[in-house]
């Protein structure tokens, strides 16, 4: 599982700048998805062979003009407590402040690594920039410039030193799904409905604040693993009014699942947080099933309004199946499993190269990719580049400027033909020269003869053999 790194510090020390630098390589994965609005306080990154999740806790801090920190928001404290490592950012130009000391006192109580990074040190000698911060007793200060990238790689290499390199994902032979969603939408009720009251009691166990609970169970002869982020409890103990939303726990659960079940509350408007959580799953490439809960509490007109709002605000989830359920009554829960199975099969599909190439050729016959300047991209063949989510690699020439709209056209075509309902689909391009191409248009043109050998013939053509100059 990817380690989670929390960025901590008082306002205006450069947390957002550092966050953007650490996550910029991942932004393009969802940037071209129409309708997706993404909260920029979480993301993914990589240093060499080590991937990581990163959370900018500054996004959860209250915005106040005075009396700042350490009355950090509850979610900031929760994120710090749940992270695998913490980067404490201070301002090398402003120097040590009372707020820095208060935050450091809290961080010294943690039982996980804390790395002190002195930011905004452009043009300063490292020894001078970090000198006064030794007082915080958090180890040797690491001097960086988030704006220019100086020292950032060295910082992250040190942070990730104790964590293993990326390993191949476990080839799960059955669906492993996470129930995700914002607070108070009925996740715990749905988990209880899925497992059954007896099953919940049998598996009732204390989980730590940092870990979700993994439960294997069988349903109609099929094996599943459910990842419960809220904690499995007896129904009498469930009090969703007290439920806290954990960004880190949700991110980790999605990363470790092969299917995510997103729970929405039909009685509430689709919120930014709903779209953000959906964005987690989309960026991670996870298969997705959406459960719209408390559906039985609405009348006909209200139901139609909810459907319209979902279509407008979550249109980037057009690949997912939507189910309208009542978790507390158990209505619609059985149908969820049909979609979970379908999404899992789609995510783990194996796609044959000959058929992929034939489908590509049909798509090209219907609609060619647009020209980029004077050059039209040429697509030759396709093969599968990965699973969970399925990745289709298209080979050809001049494929560096394919617009997002044409990529979505190909995604739609592949999805329809291969019946990839319920999973995101990635189409990637690889430009290369094809030495076996016999297309006359691609053959190099004959080189013109040297002028010295053409001089006499040129004169004959222009003047004639017996013409006078």
UniProtKB/Swiss-Prot annotation:
Per UniProt, residues of the EngA-type G domain are: 3-167, 175-348
Residues that coordinate or bind GTP 2: 181-188, 228-232, 293-296
Q: Which CDD domains match?
A: EngA1, EngA2
Annotated residues that bind GTP 1 are located at 9-16, 56-60, 119-122
- InterPro entries under this entry? AAA+_ATPase, G_ENGA, GTP-bd, GTPase_Der, KH_dom-like, KH_dom-like_a/b, P-loop_NTPase, Small_GTP-bd
- Keywords, ordered alphabetically: GTP-binding, Nucleotide-binding, Repeat, Ribosome biogenesis
Gene3D superfamilies named among the record's database cross-references: 3.30.300.20, P-loop containing nucleotide triphosphate hydrolases
The chain positions of domain KH-like read 349-433
Task: State the superkingdom.
Answer: Bacteria
Q: Which GO terms describe its molecular function?
A: ATP hydrolysis activity; GTP binding; ribosome binding
One GO term of the biological process aspect: ribosome biogenesis
| Segments for region (Disordered) | 429-469
Q: Answer yes or no on keyword Nucleotide-binding.
A: yes
UniProt cross-references to HAMAP family, sorted A to Z: GTPase_Der
Fill in the subunit field for this protein.
Answer: Associates with the 50S ribosomal subunit.
The task this protein performs is described as: GTPase that plays an essential role in the late steps of ribosome biogenesis.
| Entry similarity comment | Belongs to the TRAFAC class TrmE-Era-EngA-EngB-Septin-like GTPase superfamily. EngA (Der) GTPase family.
Q: What is this protein called?
A: GTPase Der
State the species of origin. Answer: Chromobacterium violaceum (strain ATCC 12472 / DSM 30191 / JCM 1249 / CCUG 213 / NBRC 12614 / NCIMB 9131 / NCTC 9757 / MK)
Q: Corresponding gene? A: der
């Amino acid at each position: 599982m990817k380690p989670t790194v929390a960025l901590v510090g008082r306002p205006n020390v450069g947390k957002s700048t550092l966050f953007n630098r650490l996550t910029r390589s991942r932004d393009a994965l969802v940037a071209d998805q129409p309708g997706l609005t993404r909260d920029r306080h979480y993301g993914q990154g990589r240093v060499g062979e080590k991937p990581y999740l990163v959370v900018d806790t500054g996004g959860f801090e209250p915005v106040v003009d005075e009396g700042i920190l350490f009355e950090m928001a509850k979610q900031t404290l929760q994120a710090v407590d749940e992270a695998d490592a913490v980067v404490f950012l201070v301002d090398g130009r402003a120097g040590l402040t009372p707020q820095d000391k208060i935050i450091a006192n809290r961080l010294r109580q943690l039982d996980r690594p804390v790395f002190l990074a002195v930011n905004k040190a452009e043009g300063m000698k490292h020894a001078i920039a970090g000198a006064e911060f030794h007082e915080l007793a958090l180890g040797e200060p690491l001097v960086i410039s988030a704006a220019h990238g100086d020292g950032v790689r060295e910082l992250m290499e040190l942070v990730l030193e104790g964590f293993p390199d990326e390993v191949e994902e476990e080839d799960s032979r059955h669906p492993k799904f996470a129930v995700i969603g914002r607070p108070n939408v009925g996740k715990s009720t749905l988990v209880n409905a899925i497992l059954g009251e007896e099953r919940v009691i049998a598996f009732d166990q204390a989980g730590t604040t940092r870990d979700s609970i993994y439960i294997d169970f069988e349903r109609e002869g099929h094996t599943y693993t459910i990842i419960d982020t809220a904690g499995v409890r007896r129904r009498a103990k469930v009090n969703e009014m007290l439920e806290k939303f954990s960004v880190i726990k949700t991110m980790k659960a999605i990363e470790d699942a092969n299917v995510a079940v997103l729970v929405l509350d039909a009685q509430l408007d689709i919120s930014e947080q709903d779209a953000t959580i959906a964005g987690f799953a989309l960026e991670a490439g996870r298969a997705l099933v959406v459960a719209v809960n408390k559906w039985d509490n609405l009348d006909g007109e209200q139901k139609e309004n909810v459907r319209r709002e979902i279509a407008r605000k979550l249109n980037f989830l057009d690949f997912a199946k939507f189910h309208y359920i009542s978790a507390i009554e158990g209505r619609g829960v059985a149908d969820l499993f049909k979609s979970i199975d379908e999404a899992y099969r789609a995510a783990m599909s194996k796609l044959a190269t000959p058929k992929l190439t034939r489908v590509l050729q049909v798509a090209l016959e219907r609609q060619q990719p647009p020209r980029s300047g004077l050059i039209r991209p040429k697509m030759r063949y396709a093969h599968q580049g990965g699973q969970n989510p399925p990745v289709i690699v298209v080979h050809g020439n001049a494929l560096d400027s394919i617009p997002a709209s044409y990529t979505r056209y190909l995604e739609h075509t592949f999805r329809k033909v291969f019946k990839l309902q319920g999973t995101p689909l990635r189409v990637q391009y690889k430009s290369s020269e094809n030495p076996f191409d016999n297309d006359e248009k691609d053959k190099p043109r004959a080189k013109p003869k040297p002028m010295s050998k053409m001089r006499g013939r040129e004169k004959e053509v222009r003047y004639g053999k017996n013409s006078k100059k």
